[in-house]
């Protein structure tokens, strides 16, 4: 459902941000 999509998108966003911070 929509909530599951939001959860997935949030996890992806967190992973992306974490990777960006780690690569600095």
UniProtKB/Swiss-Prot annotation:
Its chief place of residence is secreted
| Compartments in which it is found | Secreted
User: Per its UniProt entry, which superkingdom is the organism in?
Assistant: Eukaryota
- Give a yes or no for keyword Mitochondrion in this entry: no
Recorded GO cellular component terms are: extracellular region
Write out the entry's keywords from A to Z: Amphibian defense peptide, Antibiotic, Antimicrobial, Secreted
* Entry comment describing in which tissues the protein is expressed: Expressed by the skin glands.
Annotated GO biological processes are: defense response to Gram-negative bacterium; defense response to Gram-positive bacterium
The answer, when asked if Transmembrane helix is one of the entry's keywords, is no
Q: What does this protein do?
A: Antimicrobial peptide that shows higher potency against Gram-negative bacteria than against Gram-positive bacteria. Has a very week hemolytic activity.
Q: Identify its protein family.
A: Belongs to the ascaphin family.
Name assigned to this protein: Ascaphin-7
Instruction: Tell me what organism the protein belongs to.
Output: Ascaphus truei (Coastal tailed frog)
């Amino acid at each position: 459902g929509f909530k599951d999509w939001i959860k997935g998108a949030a996890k992806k966003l967190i992973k992306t941000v974490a990777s960006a911070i780690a690569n600095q």
